[in-house]
């Protein structure tokens, strides 16, 4: 251990860790944490490599051996925290994950945008959420950080190089998704029959 703080949003949970805090409601605690069953969109379950399956099963049987580092600081939307001599504001940005968190330094105009906004690719939008429309939630989060406009001078992503004009990149990502949705509508109209997510993917890629 290094003693470094691990900062997360207040709702952060490790879905495969049965040793998470006791404040989780009974229904959630009773729900299997590993996505071996049906997917949220109704298709067949994931087929994981045997090594990965053994890891997940081991983590539930021997939690002390597989325990992930615990967050030491949990932040709510709009909370401020001092890091490395800078004052950062927490921005909750559900989309890639339900508990994704960005940090903004208004004095220097620096946005730590993590996996929320990436410069050359679009983040995966998780279906492992209670949100009935996670893509809409992602769009709302893009609008939230995009609204900072020129206040953001530089954005630091989790993948790729630092980039400028965060608001423009947010618009580009939304346009990409809208284009994909339009293509799905065309496919649905042409085939005129129900399709699974897997079948739709075959027409998209």
Stretches found by the model and what they are:
Residues 191-205:
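Short acidic, hydrophobic short linear motifs in intrinsically disordered regions
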């Amino acid at each position: 251990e290094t003693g470094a703080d691990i900062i997360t949003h207040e709702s952060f949970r490790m879905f495969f860790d049965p040793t998470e805090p006791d404040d989780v409601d009974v229904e959630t605690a009773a729900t299997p944490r590993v996505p071996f069953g049906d997917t949220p969109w109704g298709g067949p379950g994931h087929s994981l490599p045997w090594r990965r399956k053994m890891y997940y099963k081991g983590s539930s049987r021997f939690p002390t051996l597989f325990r992930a580092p615990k967050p030491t600081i949990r932040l709510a939307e709009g909370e401020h925290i001092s890091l490395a001599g800078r004052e950062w504001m927490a921005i909750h940005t559900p989309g890639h994950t339900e508990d994704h968190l960005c940090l903004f330094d208004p004095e220097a105009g620096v946005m730590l945008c993590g996996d929320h906004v990436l410069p050359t690719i679009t983040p995966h939008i998780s279906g492992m959420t209670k949100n009935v429309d996670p893509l809409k939630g992602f769009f709302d989060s893009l609008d939230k950080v995009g609204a900072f406009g020129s206040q953001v001078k530089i954005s630091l992503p989790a993948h790729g190089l630092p980039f400028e004009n965060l608001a423009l990149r947010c618009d580009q990502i939304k346009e990409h998704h809208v284009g994909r949705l339009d293509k799905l509508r065309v496919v649905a109209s042409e085939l005129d029959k129900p399709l699974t997510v897997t079948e739709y993917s075959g027409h998209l890629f």
